[in-house]
Amino acid sequence: MRPNLFRLLAVCAALLFGQPAIAQTPPAAPSSGLAIATFAGGCFWCMEEPFDKIDGVFSAYSGYMGGKTKNPTYEQVSRGGTGHAEVVQITYDPAKVPYNRLLDTFWVNIDPVDKAGQFCDRGDVYRPEIFVHTEEQRKQAEASKAKLDGSKQLPWPVAVPVTDASTFTKAEDYHQKFYKKSVAHYKSYRAGCGRDARLEALWGKNATAPKTQ
């Protein structure tokens, strides 16, 4: 599935007019005491920002997971057929931020009832998915999903699968921290894609966590 027009224009404009330099380092194995979480929620640009703002998150990288093609590129993934989804992989300190907090942040930044894409981005590449790295993460993810479903807060059942994590491939550098590098293009893309309008309709204007209590 090729990128939608709003996103294609944002990428082209950012590459054409340049971006402020932001140092990028490849993701490494977590240090002792740190853990990894991986979420697919449509456009990975939009999923980095909310996790970056959480105290206790060490890093958040855009990338690809869930497919069979080794070392996929953005062009390959966006064409479709690789099986990969756009994801954000987070390294965090569980002593400062529990996994359930990351789950809460994930839910309110996606449309959980749309399994065929997210917002204006359609196709398997943009599917929502929770990739778990441990059995404990699986238990918490399944419990969080069931709790949200049981709350009847959403118009339809939650359609987000919980899947074992596979190989993570870091996306190209121009995708990393796009919301900081190209603020105007990023905001234009979000608005044009209808992301914020849909999130407000689902969760409320100032939602920070789903109402599952």
Model-based region annotation:
Residues 2-5, 12, 16, 20-213:
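Flexible coil/turn and secondary-structure edge motifs
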